[in-house]
């Protein structure tokens, strides 16, 4: 699902389910760590696409880390997005501190979008 479609879905569900249910979501940047969407061949293809040096003999985790670090350099925080970062945002949205928040997506992207506004 595209991020635009997700944003629209979250807003529409928030309207339909209010006031008893809050509907929110997260919009993460690329999460490489722990992702099944990044098998070795895809990681190597991405490293080649971006002309990043790598060792073919490196472990799968080592190659994924190289790719994650490259993606991190493209953000304002220079931090790789980790599944734990996404989980923390979800926990916030599900908890009492967000009791008046509904119909929104929280970007978990290290400022990726803003990095390209410059």
Which ranges hold each PLM region?
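Active-site helix of classical SDR
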Residues: 2, 10
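Short, flexible catalytic-loop segment of classical short-chain dehydrogenase/reductase
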Residues: 27-39, 48-56
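A short hydrophobic alpha-helix cap/turn motif
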Residues: 15-19, 31, 81, 94
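Short C-terminal tail/terminal secondary-structure segment
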Residues: 90-91, 102-118
């Amino acid at each position: 699902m595209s991020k635009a479609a997700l944003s629209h879905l979250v807003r529409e569900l928030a309207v339909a389910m209010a006031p008893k249910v809050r509907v929110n979501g997260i919009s993460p940047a690329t999460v490489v760590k722990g992702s099944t969407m990044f098998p070795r061949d895809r990681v190597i293809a991405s490293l080649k696409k971006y002309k990043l040096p790598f060792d073919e003999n490196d472990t799968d985790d080592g190659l994924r880390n190289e790719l994650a670090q490259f993606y991190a350099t493209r953000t304002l925080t220079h931090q790789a997005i980790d599944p734990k970062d996404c989980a923390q945002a979800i926990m916030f949205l599900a908890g009492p501190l967000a009791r008046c928040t509904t119909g929104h997506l929280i970007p978990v992207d290290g400022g990726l979008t803003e990095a390209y506004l410059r």
